[in-house]
Amino acid sequence: MILLISDLHLEQDRPDITRAFLDLLAGRAREAEALYILGDFFEVWIGDDAMSPFQLSICKALRALSDSGTRIFLMHGNRDFMIGKGFCKAAGCTLLSDPSVVQLNGERVLLMHGDSLCTRDEGYIRMRRYLRHPLTLFILRHLPLGTRHKLARKLRNESRAQTRMKANDIVDVTPDEVPRIMQQFGVRTLVHGHTHRPAIHKLQIGDQAARRIVLGDWDRQGWVLQVDEQGFSLNSFDFVPETTALLN
């Protein structure tokens, strides 16, 4: 069994999401061969040298899962693209490039965060290219912590404001980009997050059937894609209320 999740946007202000994730690590993930986290794991990440006590606790929880035998793979999202080798080493996880092709159930599957598929949002794509440039990352990682915190808040607020103003089709994936990149990598299954629109889309690429699986964001409920001998299954689950969690 392999589990894939994305867009948890973990932060201290959402203890319900954190509890649900820790429950997953202590339960089903212990039985899994691997756990893939496809970006926006944290709501914000300003550097491995600036881990808060909350982020450190998540790191330790991942390490415990890794030490139990479950392999963990982490991909950058647009919120946490500054996660580096230091965090991954401490957490016992492997950093995946975006995109990456992996073998799931004997099938070549393309994994992405998904933001690079939104090519109609030209302003975002330009900003993404700038922020991910090695020189930009080097500069950002060497800014004072206070400056990084202020910059992260500014970018997050601007992103939220712009997303609200943009048409739905602009912030969703570009239809033509999906078959293009799937053909480029020679796959018939694409799994991504980012858009917060969970679904399994059936496609036709040339004369072959294909599919695009969109992972859900963890906000009002959690989402997990499970891959096992039965195939690919995308399911949601409700968060356990705090009072119930305390009783248990």
Swiss-Prot record:
Record carries keyword Aminoacyl-tRNA synthetase: no
Subcellular location: Cell inner membrane
Cofactor: Mn(2+)
EC numbers on record: 3.6.1.54
Residues spanning the membrane: none
Keywords: Cell inner membrane, Cell membrane, Hydrolase, Lipid A biosynthesis, Lipid biosynthesis, Lipid metabolism, Manganese, Membrane, Metal-binding
Free-text comment on the cofactor: Binds 2 Mn(2+) ions per subunit in a binuclear metal center.
UniProt: Mn(2+) 2 binding residues: 40, 78, 113, 194
Protein's job: Hydrolyzes the pyrophosphate bond of UDP-2,3-diacylglucosamine to yield 2,3-diacylglucosamine 1-phosphate (lipid X) and UMP by catalyzing the attack of water at the alpha-P atom. Involved in the biosynthesis of lipid A, a phosphorylated glycolipid that anchors the lipopolysaccharide to the outer membrane of the cell.
HAMAP family to which the protein is assigned, alphabetical: LpxH
Protein name: UDP-2,3-diacylglucosamine hydrolase
Gene that produces this protein: lpxH
